[in-house]
Amino acid sequence: MFNRPNRNDVDDGVQDIQNDVNQLADSLESVLKSWGSDAKGEAEAARSKAQALLKETRARMHGRTRVQQAARDAVGCADSFVRERPWCSVGTAAAVGIFIGALLSMRKS
């Protein structure tokens, strides 16, 4: 009925984007290196700013990859827990629902 994207398709898309960004960063780095010592004044400032931006972008990409992997691991653990203990999961969800309902009813009073 509903067409949800396959997790592997999403992971492949994320990997493709990361590869594209890495290729772009590599080509920017090679351009900056080839620009080399001919740069003076403003060009040198632009070069150093571009290098700083490149380092920052690579650091962010590395951090996001680590966070994405941690999120995938957490989802995998939750999925296996629910599949192994479905009634425990239903009970936990019901208890959380009752707790939230009690909090909301106290708030209205």
Swiss-Prot record:
It is found in: Cell inner membrane. InterPro entries: DUF883_C (IPR043605), DUF883_N (IPR043604), YqjD/ElaB (IPR010279). The keyword Membrane applies. Keywords: Cell inner membrane, Cell membrane, Membrane, Transmembrane, Transmembrane helix. It holds the Pfam family DUF883_C. Induction: Maximally expressed between 6 and 12 hours of growth, in early stationary phase. It is a single-pass membrane protein. One of its GO terms (molecular function) is ribosome binding. GO terms for cellular component: cytosol; plasma membrane. The chain crosses the membrane at residues 87-106. Its main location: membrane. The keyword Cytoplasm does not apply. Belongs to the ElaB/YgaM/YqjD family. Upon overexpression binds to ribosomes. This is Uncharacterized protein YgaM. It comes from Escherichia coli (strain K12). The lineage of its organism: Bacteria, Pseudomonadati, Pseudomonadota, Gammaproteobacteria, Enterobacterales. The gene is ygaM.
